[in-house]
Regions:
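Distinct, well-ordered alpha-helical segments
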Residues: 123-131, 152-162
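Canonical Radical SAM [4Fe-4S] cluster-binding loop centered on the CxxxCxxC motif
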Residues: 41-87
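Core AdoMet radical
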Residues: 75-95, 99-123, 138-151, 167-168
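Acidic (Asp/Glu)-rich catalytic clusters
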Residues: 100, 131-137, 159-167
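Short, Gly/Pro- and small/polar-rich lid/capping loops
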Residues: 20-40
Length: 168
């Protein structure tokens, strides 16, 4: 019984020591949460505002397949304000209002190009849509969802240029 109690005491001390450690990201959690990362990086709560920029995907338009991927059901995770018939600016404005009602602490936003493959278009179109989003005064950066086979060197160069003055 004494040996078992001693073992339990050692386990408890070990767990306390682990939980008291600060990890390289400055937190005592074993993982670096996205919200904590943004709070450290920007000094405030940052909220993603989803945007549907009207892009398609090679698994939808016939280049690779039809019907899309099983896991990519945009209707399941797209907010009601997020419609490709609306301008990027209008979606951002409506998204910010939505998040202000829901998360009152957010004061800066990331334009989240979420629906489908957001690099599956000519660079001029991408540039126009990303620039429109990044020109909004409350948007501090962009999060761009895509497929690796839809990212060219030219697009990567553009992202590198954007990243000099924006969070990308």
């Amino acid at each position: 019984l004494h040996a078992k109690t001693e073992q339990n005491s050692i386990k408890i001390l070990f767990l306390q020591k682990i939980s008291a450690m600060a990890y390289s990201w400055g937190d005592d959690r074993r993982y670096n949460s996205y919200s904590a990362y943004f709070r450290r990086r920007f000094g405030e709560r940052v909220q993603k505002v989803a945007i549907n920029a009207g892009f398609s995907c090679p698994n939808r338009d016939g280049k690779v397949g039809f019907g899309g991927c099983t896991f990519c059901n945009n209707e399941a995770f797209t907010p009601s304000y997020c419609q490709p018939s609306k301008s990027i600016t209008q979606q951002i404005e409506e998204g910010i209002e939505f998040h202000r009602r829901r998360y009152r602490k957010a004061s800066s936003y990331l334009a989240y190009f979420q629906s489908f493959s957001n690099t599956y278009a000519p660079l001029e179109i991408l540039r126009s849509r990303y620039d429109e989003a990044l020109s909004h005064p409350e948007v501090i950066g962009a999060v761009i969802g895509t497929r690796p086979d839809c990212v060219s060197e030219e697009i990567l160069d553009y992202f590198a240029e954007l990243a000099k003055s924006n969070y990308v």
